[in-house]
A protein has these predicted regions:
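Long, basic N-terminal domains or extensions that often function
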Residues: 1-232
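Extended amphipathic alpha-helical scaffolds
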Residues: 1-45, 49, 232-375, 558-572, ...
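Glycine-rich, flexible beta-strand/loop modules in the N-terminal catalytic cores of phosphate-handling
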Residues: 25-109, 115-117, 122, 188, ...
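Conserved phosphate/anionic-ligand binding catalytic regions in large, soluble enzymes, centered on
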Residues: 27-29, 122-140, 336-359, 440-460, ...
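Short, hydrophobic beta-strand segments
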Residues: 113, 185-190, 231-235, 246-256, ...
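Mobile "lid/hinge" segments at catalytic clefts and subdomain interfaces of large enzymes
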Residues: 140-259, 455-551
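Long, charged amphipathic helices and adjacent flexible linkers at domain junctions
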Residues: 231-238, 537-563, 617, 621-641
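Single-stranded RNA-binding regions, centering on S1/OB-family and related RNA-binding modules
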Residues: 558, 567-709
């Protein structure tokens, strides 16, 4: 039976419909927020893979172009693989929901958000997050929700929940915060150098709004929520836990105190493998399925022992995995100009994490076109993150970037975008690529540091240097410890990964994921304060390596020349079918194809701005002269030197400069009578002509006879 629920949320209607659509799904809701409409469905598998060591949750965010009145491009005319924005939206929904499922739940869960209608002023991502939580909460799937999320902006010092497009354009904070009715459990933010105090205020402002949304969900759940299903899970006896612990607790404790990453991991693997081998012999009489199940239990107990000992060492003894103090940063080193032919390069190493970053400058016309649910937009700054398997000493898949690589790249891009100069100040498309060469945690933050230095080495006049640091949280009973600059094990066995990037003046980006149900305001405040202190130390190392952006771009990077022409003349510069601009590029560069790597690049803008790019200043000047010649208007009575480009029976056409030619009628070829045009003029001949003006149809008339009198 269809049911409708309604909430007036911050001046806009939030409407929930259930019981009519997708009734064969385990749970389904249709949510309307303004004119944004999202159908969220959740399905749980009938059987659990109890031997799996992870929870198989898949969140999908399906952008339907009909939702914004678009037909997909290309030959197929169907939606294809998810856009980067869709991938990031799916991750944003997954992150606050995942900690709310039971730890031992192993049934596959698939949440599908279908975006049916989009009103740009009402976020489909936040609508989908709300819908995903509610669809799961009212279903039989065990889920300790609900959760919800909001966007927070700040315009003229005033905080705003779910800002409109116009408000977002004028906002100095772009914050997404999610959580339960009790605590925050996910943060994503970009900001224009905002103070820690102001960011904390924005977080708590968002949390107050989240409580309203979760209270609304609770009312719906109380009305129509199903009884939660019983689910299959491995039952591990206390006797087995005690038995395994007696065999290896002291060995694991000793191994966890080894400071070197590979030595520590190898020793832990050796201890676990020996225990597993011992139990495999013990369970030899069991059939294969029973044996596999019992060995899985042993492995889970080993993981639990490692987990508990590690947390006790950190919280009780105040000892970290590599021997550092709680607020101590790993050893830092930095270098620039490693790669001779790139436009800018930098290497940043923090402990056993290392990023090689390369900056490339291109013409504005080389920007990325984003054609998704938003209006088609252009992106002139990009940061791409690559995480090869060799960086952690492993083999594995190589191919298109996965969700994690896309997410880490987006975080680095968001941090550095805050300090990128405007198009008017620096008319380039900028691409930064971070190659992770070694990793032991916080590789996204190393990418920000290396990326910033490579921008400076490339001569990009950034507003301020940016550094990033990852903060961690370890809880043990009622106690907790916050860690600065977490490494891989502290991330894997810890409760929080809180990445903070910024300048000396404030925060530029945040990202927080946690494995527990939520964290308090006090923990957030302490983490932000410690991150600021650490950030200053990292910036010191970076600025000792390169103090400021280079004054000039690399000799291998394109130089630029910008000038204005009459906007009405842009079409003349382009020419019919692009003929004129193509000929200018070919002639000025000395290339056959405009796609040649040595071809000059020309950006023509609707307002009459012309930007020319090339590594050779002479080529730029030659191109500029040819373009200016096109927009020049011949003056009546003035004599010009041109070249014959076409001969016809009634005369010849003479090109005065590229894009400008006129007719010399046969009667104007000479002071004497001319019987045959080719007696005087042939293609390629130079000719002195006088401008006679334009005829009634706007055609240019020239005369050789008048010029030689």
């Amino acid at each position: 039976m269809k049911k409708v629920y309604e909430l007036d949320f911050r001046g806009r209607k939030l409407i929930v419909e259930t019981g009519e659509l997708a009734k064969q799904a385990t749970g389904a809701v249709l949510v309307r927020y303004g004119d944004t409409v999202v159908l969220s469905t959740v399905v749980v598998s009938k059987n659990a893979n109890v031997l799996s060591d992870f929870f198989p949750l898949m969140v999908l965010y399906q952008e339907k172009l009909y939702s914004v009145g678009k037909i997909p491009g290309g030959f197929i005319k169907r939606e294809g693989r998810p856009t980067e924005a869709a991938t990031l939206a799916a991750r944003m929904i997954d992150r606050p929901m995942r900690p709310m499922f039971p730890d031992n739940f192993r049934n596959e869960v698939q949440i599908v958000n279908t975006i049916l209608s989009v009103d740009p002023d009402n976020s489909p991502e936040m609508t989908a997050m709300f819908a995903s939580s509610l669809a799961t909460s009212i279903s039989k799937i065990p889920f300790d929700g609900p959760i919800a999320g909001v966007k927070v902006g700040r315009v003229d010092g005033n905080l705003i929940i779910n800002p409109t497009v116009e408000q977002s354009e004028n906002s100095d904070i772009d914050l997404t915060v999610a959580g339960s009715i009790d605590a925050i459990n996910m943060v994503e933010a970009g900001a224009k150098e905002v103070s820690e105090g102001d960011m904390l205020d924005a977080l708590m402002f968002g949390f107050d709004a989240i409580k309203e949304l979760n209270k609304f969900q609770k009312e719906i759940i109380d009305d129509i929520g199903e009884e939660k299903m019983e689910y299959e899970a491995l039952e591990i006896s206390d006797d087995l836990k005690v038995e395994v612990e007696e065999k290896c607790k002291s060995d694991i404790d000793s191994a966890l105190r080894i400071k070197d990453k590979l030595e520590k991991y190898n020793k832990l693997d050796e201890i676990k493998e020996n225990i597993v081998l011992e139990y495999e012999e013990k369970y030899n009489d069991l059939d294969d399925e029973e044996k596999k199940e019992e060995i899985t239990k042993v492995k889970l107990v080993l993981e639990e022992i490692e987990y508990e000992i590690f947390r006790s060492i950190v919280v009780k003894e105040k000892l970290r995995a590599d021997g550092r103090e709680m607020t101590e940063i790993r050893p830092l080193s930095a270098d620039v100009d490693l790669l001779p032919r790139t436009h800018g390069s930098a290497l940043f190493t923090r402990g056993e994490t290392q990023s090689l970053s390369v900056t490339t400058l291109g013409a504005l016309g080389e920007h990325q076109i984003l054609d998704g649910l938003d209006l088609e937009t252009e992106k002139r700054f990009m940061l791409h993150y690559n995480f090869p398997q060799f960086s952690v000493g492993e083999t594995g898949r190589y191919g298109a970037p996965g969700r994690r690589e896309i997410g880490h790249g987006a975080l680095g891009e968001r941090a550095l975008a805050q300090v990128i100069p405007s198009e008017e100040e620096f008319p380039y498309t900028i691409r930064v690529v971070s190659e992770i060469l070694e990793s032991n945690g916080s590789s996204s933050q190393a990418s920000i540091c290396a990326g910033c230095m490579s921008l400076m080495a490339a001569g990009v006049p950034i507003k301020s240097p940016v550094a990033g640091i990852a903060m961690g949280l370890i809880t043990y009973g009622d106690e907790y410890t916050i860690l600065t600059d977490i490494q891989g094990m502290e991330d894997h066995l810890g409760d929080m990964d809180f990445k903070v990037a910024g300048t000396r003046d404030g925060i530029c980006a945040l990202q927080m994921d946690i494995k527990i149900k939520g964290i308090t305001k006090e923990i957030l405040a302490e983490a932000l304060a410690n991150a600021k202190e650490a950030r200053m130390k990292v910036l010191d190392v970076m600025l000792n390596t390169i103090k400021e952006p280079r004054k000039e771009v690399s000799k291998y990077a394109p130089k630029t020349l910008t000038f204005m022409v009459d906007p009405e003349k842009i079409k003349d510069i382009i020419g019919k079918g692009g003929d004129t601009i193509t000929k200018i590029i070919q002639d000025a560069s000395g290339v056959i194809s405009v796609n040649d790597i040595n071809a000059v690049k020309v950006d023509l803008e609707d307002d009459g701005k012309v930007i020319i790019y090339h590594t050779d200043k002479e080529v730029i000047e030659k191109t500029a002269k040819m373009i200016k010649d096109v927009v020049r208007v011949p003056e009546e009575g003035v004599i010009y030197k041109g070249k014959v480009v076409k001969v016809i029976d009634s005369g010849c056409f003479v090109e005065l400069w590229p894009g400008c030619d006129g007719l010399v009628h046969i009667s104007e070829l000479d002071v004497k009578r001319v019987e045959k045009v080719t007696d005087i003029a042939n293609v390629g001949d130079e000719m002195i002509v006088k401008c006679l003006g334009y005829d009634k149809r706007g055609r240019l008339n020239l005369s050789r006879k008048a010029a030689i009198k």
